[in-house]
């Protein structure tokens, strides 16, 4: 498995936009999570974001909150999630990025947490409730063990804050396309295009756009606006949760392929 930075560099060399699907670990069960990681990798995912179920997911919309609630109801813990990553990571090409709130990191201690996730094969972290002002306590030790901590840019952020986040973010920059929580939207606001332009003037780091992207045409639109990656969460989680686990897997495999095909289309 390659690092997050190496993956983006390879894609840039080939002038390709990365597809980053998101799923919630443990929904509907851990066995299906392992199968889903393998399937997404085989269906065109360039990186995969794996959500750790959490009881108070402030950044997540109803679809991902419900998935986390179901997983927690089955007793899924961080150690279980990392067990799946350890099993699957040697078999797939796509780097796994763990999406986790800060409390599990704080509870275990930064150093112990990083050693634990590194040993499992995690290549990156997204911590949505980690403020920029406190990020250094995680960024520096994570960098030392080879884990990229990607920071989020909100659409309401002033340019000075955008520039500060761009300087510190590792691997890529996560541009949140909408104010509020994750979830499916009917369209992607043109504000994203403006934000991509502002960010691009501040950094040459890869920029991924997430929150609200739910259709192949959204993915193509954001790519054509200049994004280096498209992150698809709620629409993926919703498909995986519908029907039997086998039906859910079939649905996300087909959806992932459709998204990948859209990203290959010319403007």
Swiss-Prot record:
Look at the named UniProt entry and state the broad enzyme category this protein falls under.
lyase
Fetch the Gene3D superfamilies from UniProt.
Aldolase class I
The organism's place on the tree of life at top rank? Bacteria
So where's the catalytic machinery, residue-wise?
Answer: 49, 60
Question: Does the record bear Zinc-finger in its keywords?
Answer: no
Task: Name the chemical reaction catalysed here.
Answer: (1S,2R)-1-C-(indol-3-yl)glycerol 3-phosphate + L-serine = D-glyceraldehyde 3-phosphate + L-tryptophan + H2O
Pfam families for the chain: Trp_syntA
Q: Does the keyword Lyase apply?
A: yes
Named in its record, the pathway it takes part in is: Amino-acid biosynthesis; L-tryptophan biosynthesis; L-tryptophan from chorismate: step 5/5
User: Which GO cellular component terms, listed alphabetically, does the Swiss-Prot or TrEMBL entry include?
Assistant: cytosol
E.C. code: 4.2.1.20
Q: Which UniProt keywords apply?
A: Amino-acid biosynthesis, Aromatic amino acid biosynthesis, Lyase, Tryptophan biosynthesis
Summarize the protein's role.
The alpha subunit is responsible for the aldol cleavage of indoleglycerol phosphate to indole and glyceraldehyde 3-phosphate.
Q: How does it assemble?
A: Tetramer of two alpha and two beta chains.
* Family stated for the protein in its record: Belongs to the TrpA family.
| Record PANTHER family | TRYPTOPHAN SYNTHASE ALPHA CHAIN, CHLOROPLASTIC, TRYPTOPHAN SYNTHASE, ALPHA CHAIN
Protein name in UniProt: Tryptophan synthase alpha chain
- Species annotation: Rippkaea orientalis (strain PCC 8801 / RF-1) (Cyanothece sp. (strain PCC 8801))
Give the gene that encodes this protein: trpA
């Amino acid at each position: 498995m390659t690092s997050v930075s190496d993956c983006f560099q390879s894609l840039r060399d080939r002038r390709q936009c990365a597809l980053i699907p998101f799923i919630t670990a443990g929904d509907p069960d851990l066995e299906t999570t392992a199968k889903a990681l393998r399937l997404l990798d085989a269906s065109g995912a360039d990186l995969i974001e794996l959500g750790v179920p959490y009881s108070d997911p402030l950044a997540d919309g109803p679809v991902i909150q419900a998935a986390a609630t179901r997983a927690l109801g089955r007793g899924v813990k961080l150690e279980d999630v990392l067990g799946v990553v350890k099993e699957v990571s040697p078999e797939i090409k796509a780097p796994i990025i763990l999406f986790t709130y800060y409390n599990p990191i704080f509870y275990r201690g930064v150093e112990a947490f990083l050693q634990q996730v590194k040993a499992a094969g995690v290549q990156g972290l997204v911590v949505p409730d980690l403020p920029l002002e406190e990020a250094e306590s995680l960024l520096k030790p994570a960098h030392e063990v080879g884990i990229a901590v990607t920071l989020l840019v909100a659409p309401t952020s002033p340019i000075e804050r955008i520039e500060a986040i761009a300087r510190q973010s590792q691997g890529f920059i996560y541009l949140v396309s909408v104010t509020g929580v994750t979830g499916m939207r009917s369209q992607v606001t043109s504000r994203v295009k403006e934000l991509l332009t502002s960010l691009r003037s501040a950094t040459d780091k890869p920029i991924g756009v997430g929150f609200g992207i739910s259709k192949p045409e959204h993915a193509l639109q954001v790519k054509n606006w200049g994004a280096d990656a498209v992150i698809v969460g709620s629409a993926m989680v919703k498909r995986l949760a519908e029907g039997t686990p086998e039906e859910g897997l079939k649905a996300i495999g087909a959806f992932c392929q459709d998204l990948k095909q859209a990203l290959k289309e010319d403007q």
